[in-house]
Amino acid sequence: MKNFLFLVTLYCEVLCMLASCGKDDDNPVPEPEINRFVLFGKTYPAFTVFVSKEVLGKGNYDIYVYPAEDNTIELGLQCSMQHDGMSLDLTKYDPLNAVPGYSGWMWYISVEKTEEGKEEYLLEGWGGDAPTMGILGVAGDILYIKSLNKDHTQFEIRCKLTDPEKRSLVFYYKGNVTLATE
């Protein structure tokens, strides 16, 4: 009888240990990113991403995003191909400013609204080092552009920008893009 009680107690202890340790996950698997375009708190679930083929030939990325539900809005993301795969801190001037003699593209982000032939900049950021021209973001703002293949038809793009007026953009995309001719 003592052996039976001992085995039942041991069995219960093992079950309790398994139940308490079963879901203690110190290294959870991160949720996969989903494609999203959020401008000033409004989510645009469907959008199209274009990359300028002509500008690729000059060593730069010129990317345009158009929400399906609002054809008046255009998101523009630009930077040198030298930034490919780099996470740029948008609170700082473009690191290529420090390269002697560099005259290529700096990072640039814009959101434009075009109605009745009139363009209005809703949000803008630029990594130039001229005090009157640099429009930097706030802590945590980044631009990350990575071409995922040699022919530049697949990209991973991440952008978060908040301007001095606290207007914000959050954009993430990983997938195929359309190569556009100007």
Model-identified regions with their sequence ranges:
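Surface-exposed helix/loop patches within compact recognition domains
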Residues: 55-146
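Edge beta-strand at a domain terminus
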Residues: 141, 156-182
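Sec-dependent bacterial lipoprotein signal peptides
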Residues: 1-20
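Tryptophan-anchored aromatic micro-motifs
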Residues: 32-53, 57-59, 124-127
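Bacterial Sec-dependent N-terminal signal peptides
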Residues: 16-45, 181
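A mature extracytoplasmic/lumenal domain signature
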Residues: 43, 79-81, 92-94, 149, ...
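Short, hydrophobic/aromatic-rich segments at coil-to-beta transitions
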Residues: 58-62, 151-157
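N-terminal helix-cap/turn-to-beta initiation motif at the start of protein domains
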Residues: 26-32, 143-152
